[in-house]
């Protein structure tokens, strides 16, 4: 996206072991219901929904750049508030208030989504700061390494044991970050904050499982964040000054539209997750950072010195290693399940 680039959301592990996104750029913001089984046939509508979601997350930098001279703090606050407004409208139109209120009255779910909201707020703030400060390529890096960071977090929080190949992938990624840090004479903080905030976001969202639909999840998260967003707007208004309503009608419409461009890819992602096997979702998740990378290099002409190319190539190698290992493991698990099913006694 996942968030999504831009987090996004869903929290099912794809081939890279990542949490599906709701949007930092992605994806990022809700669970998606029951996913298709690994051996389910490929759904053309599901494929269209998935590609549409990740493509929209991929081109988000261009949308945000159209909002100049709005700064990152005003933009993130506006995004939170207008996302909440749009979600409220969706709940009203789809008659989704009953299940939403049921979730909101559940203290565990509500608090968990509030904590997830804080993480996605950090993710959005970092992402938009990077985009508006000429660091689109580094934001793409954050979402490239997110699947590997998610695997890394699983070791510490879930006490998961990694296979040797997975450790190799993590090691290559660490080497990539070191190369990028040496080349840039500084740690790529934007990429690391994006990757870890979205990885932690996915971990927390797993705690509520598939009980929260996309719209209700985003509504609860943005509702928790709205007081913070209002305070942020007050501070911006008292210092730099607000731009909403001060530039042009087109600019104001685009700013209000941040709520729509946050929710629509998330809904596409939710629809895709219900129709496509997770292994396909895992591959398609790389559409967003690939598009962001291409936007940064070929449209915005961000610098790509040799050290940066080496760092990115190492990250891509790590992803190929991790994805290949996960696909092989998934196929092995599927064969074992099929063998167990075929050997089960038949009822008469």
Locations of the language-model features?
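Membrane-interface interhelical linkers
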Residues: 2-52, 85-113, 164, 212-213, ...
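C-terminal-most transmembrane helix of multi-pass membrane proteins
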Residues: 3-4, 182, 187, 286-348
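Hydrophobic alpha-helical transmembrane segments of multi-pass membrane transport proteins
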Residues: 55-59, 63, 114-131, 193-204, ...
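Juxtamembrane helix-loop-helix junctions in multi-pass membrane proteins
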Residues: 56-84, 138, 200-225
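Membrane-interface helix termini and inter-helical loops of multi-pass transporters
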Residues: 62-72, 99-101, 131-135, 177-178, ...
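Hydrophobic/aromatic residues within transmembrane alpha-helices
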Residues: 67, 75, 79, 114, ...
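C-terminal transmembrane-helix exit sites in multi-pass transporters
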Residues: 129, 146-166, 290-309
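Helix-helix packing/entry segments at the starts of transmembrane helices
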Residues: 141-145, 211-224, 263-298
């Amino acid at each position: 996206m996942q968030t999504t680039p831009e987090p996004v959301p869903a929290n099912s592990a794809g081939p890279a072991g990542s949490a599906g996104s709701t949007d930092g750029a992605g994806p990022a913001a809700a669970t998606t219901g029951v996913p298709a089984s690994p051996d389910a046939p490929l759904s053309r509508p599901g494929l269209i929904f998935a590609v549409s979601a990740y493509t929209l997350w991929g081109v988000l930098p261009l949308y945000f750049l159209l909002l100049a001279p709005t700064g990152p703090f005003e933009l993130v606050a506006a995004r939170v508030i207008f996302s909440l407004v749009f979600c409220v409208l969706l709940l009203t139109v789809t008659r989704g208030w009953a299940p939403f209120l049921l979730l909101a009255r559940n203290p565990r779910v509500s608090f968990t989504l509030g904590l997830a909201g804080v993480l996605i707020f950090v993710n959005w703030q970092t992402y938009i700061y990077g985009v508006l400060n000429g660091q689109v390529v580094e934001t793409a890096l954050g979402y490239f390494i997110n699947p590997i960071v998610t695997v890394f977090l699983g070791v510490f929080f879930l006490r998961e044991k990694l296979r040797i190949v997975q450790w190799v992938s993590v090691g290559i990624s660490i080497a990539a970050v070191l190369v990028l840090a040496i080349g840039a004479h500084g740690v790529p903080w934007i990429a690391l904050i994006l990757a870890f905030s979205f990885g932690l976001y996915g971990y927390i969202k797993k705690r509520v499982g598939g009980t929260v639909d996309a719209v209700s999840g985003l509504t609860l998260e943005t509702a928790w964040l709205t007081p913070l967003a209002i305070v942020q707007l007050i501070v911006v208004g008292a210092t730099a000054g607000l731009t909403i309503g001060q530039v042009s009608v087109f600019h104001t419409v685009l700013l209000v539209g941040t709520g729509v461009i946050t929710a629509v890819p998330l809904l596409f992602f939710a629809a895709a997750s219900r129709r496509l096997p997770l292994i396909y979702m895992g591959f398609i998740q790389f559409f967003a950072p690939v598009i962001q990378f291409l936007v940064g290099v070929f449209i915005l002409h961000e610098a790509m010195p040799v050290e940066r190319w080496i760092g990115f190539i190492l990250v891509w190698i790590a992803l190929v290693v991790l994805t290949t290992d996960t696909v092989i493991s998934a196929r092995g698990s599927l064969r074992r399940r099929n063998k167990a099913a075929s050997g089960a006694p038949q009822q008469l």
